[in-house]
């Protein structure tokens, strides 16, 4: 962990707890996987985890995902399955993100307008607390969960891996169940733009052509809660 974090190791005091948690999960996996070749985890991360263990599991989740063991947050079973599919197809680390907010107008004008062929409605911020694998971040820093720290002592919210997501082509994919018990999935192609987010968590400035329409008529209308980012794997995903 120290080698991976390098200068981003801003919370060295929490590393022993995180390391022990990771080893415990790996031991549990080996004890329970049986004949299964592959493993994926839908893990508990809040609100009870940090008060019981004294840290958040985000960094460990990111490391396991980087090992080929996808871990979803908030016991998100369909997110876990989506990550597993993305891992198998791309043969690369994936991450779960929320479609968090639109790109601020001043950021769009300063860093995107005239430089990329996207309208502001084509762009958005993809965010999660800090569960993205380090090799998918431009740089990474160990920090604390700012959202949780609004209601809890900061020292029990340490353990997020934060940084801007590496720019490049991406595929969005999500599998989800509907209220009438049907499986549905969406997929879209786009890119992460080389734009500084000036924010926290694992986060990036994303762009998909016609994202405004896609958001309204697919994500909202069909009740998809969040997204999955992988490497550029759309052709293989269509085969799946």
Language model regions located:
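Acidic catalytic cores of enzymes that act on phosphate-bearing nucleotides/polynucleotides
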Residues: 53-68
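Conserved small/polar residues in nucleotide/adenosyl-binding loops
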Residues: 229-234
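Short acidic, glycine/serine/threonine-rich loops at helix termini
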Residues: 51-56, 107-111
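C-terminal catalytic subdomain
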Residues: 65-205
């Amino acid at each position: 962990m120290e080698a991976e974090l390098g200068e981003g190791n801003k919370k060295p005091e929490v590393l022993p707890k995180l390391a022990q948690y990771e080893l415990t999960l790996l031991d549990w996996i080996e004890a329970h996987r049986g004949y299964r070749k592959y493993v994926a985890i839908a893990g508990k991360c809040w609100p009870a985890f940090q008060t019981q263990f004294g840290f958040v599991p985000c960094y460990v989740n990111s490391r396991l995902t980087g090992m080929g063991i996808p871990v979803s947050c908030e016991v998100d079973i369909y997110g876990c399955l989506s990550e597993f599919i993305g891992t198998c197809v791309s043969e690369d680390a994936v991450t779960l993100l929320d479609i968090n907010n639109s790109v601020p107008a001043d950021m769009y004008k300063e860093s995107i307008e005239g430089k990329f062929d996207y309208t502001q409605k084509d762009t958005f911020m993809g965010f999660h607390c800090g569960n993205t694998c380090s090799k998918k971040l431009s740089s990474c820093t160990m920090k604390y969960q700012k959202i949780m720290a609004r209601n809890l002592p900061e020292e029990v919210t340490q353990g997020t891996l934060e940084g801007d997501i590496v720019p490049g082509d991406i595929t969005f994919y999500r599998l989800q169940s509907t209220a009438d018990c049907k499986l549905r999935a969406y997929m879209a192609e786009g890119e992460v733009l080389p734009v500084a987010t000036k924010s926290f968590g694992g986060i990036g400035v994303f762009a998909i052509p016609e994202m405004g329409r896609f958001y309204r008529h697919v994500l909202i209308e069909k009740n998809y809660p969040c997204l999955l980012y992988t490497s550029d794997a759309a052709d293989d995903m269509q085969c799946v």
